[in-house]
Amino acid sequence: MKKVYLLSLMILSGCLLTAQPQQLISKIAFGSCASEAERQPVLDLVVKHKPDIFVYLGDNIYGDTKDMKALQAKYDSLAAKPEFQRLKKNVKLLATWDDHDYGWNDSGKWYTFKKESKELFLKFFEEPLNSDRRKHDGIYTSYMFEGNGRKLQLVLLDNRTFRSDLRLYRGELSRNEKYFYPLDYYPHEIEDSTMLGDTQWKWLEEELKKPADVRIIGSGSQFGISFNGYEAWANFPHEQKRMLALIKKTKASGVLFITGDVHYAEISKLETKGQYPIYDVTASGITSTWLFATPNDNRIEGPVMENHFGMLTIDWSKKDPGLKMEIWDVKDNQRIEHTISLSEISFMNSK
């Protein structure tokens, strides 16, 4: 009886849900940009496709407030949706945030209520009470899935809590016809700004040192695109270079990004000398849409402008596992399929 009681206490306190390796998975669904005020039929399609996990990549609600009661009410609205309840019942949910659920459009480290917002986020996604996420600033975290001699690492970054102010656009590219729309931001030219902050960077280095065959890095902001004047890692080119240098330094093969934010889907391929290509699969539009896709020199698939979700499927049965990247739209049409072999994103094949 004492053992049963102790086990119950451990479950309630989250002790059984610490960052221990979990069973190997092969199907990862993901998406972002979901207004709690709208129907979300995409979520029922996610359930239909039977992924092992679903990763929320930010703008999971549209908070945009400094009133924590209002932010909680928006989480309550999402929780009450039948389609969200079906998703939660059938698929394991993991999440990071972006600006709107963090609290304010395009906000970074100066958002006043980031600690209070964090508590609401962790409560909504049922973070274990003893989770490391509750012990440090921000919500960055990682998971390891393993079995049959293979390992998959999922890293979820926090690109809000520590991010420096963006540099405002002041007409520097006004004569460039490539940018046919109003730009908001321009890349930082000095390296005194940050996306992740020193503590998160140090943590990430230790994570990338861990053995893994596939490493999926989730970021609310797009990583692999070229500059487009909107929010992205490209506004912090020194931080983008730091990420690539860190991947190379730690010899972390198998890295692939999943991102959100922009209200359309695409796949970007970022190629640099002496390093394998970094793929970035953007799935952004559970409910949100945009009028156009911005220029992206690194785009190899897309864009898909209709509501959608993303899927990564790993074929572990092969000696050289296949990685299939997909985008499925709200009518359950496969709009993008792009498959690579794991060896293609390995330092063994870098040039």
List each model region and its residues.
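Bacterial Sec-dependent N-terminal signal peptides
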Residues: M1-Q23
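Long, structured stretches of catalytic cores involved in phosphate-ester chemistry, encompassing
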Residues: P21-K351
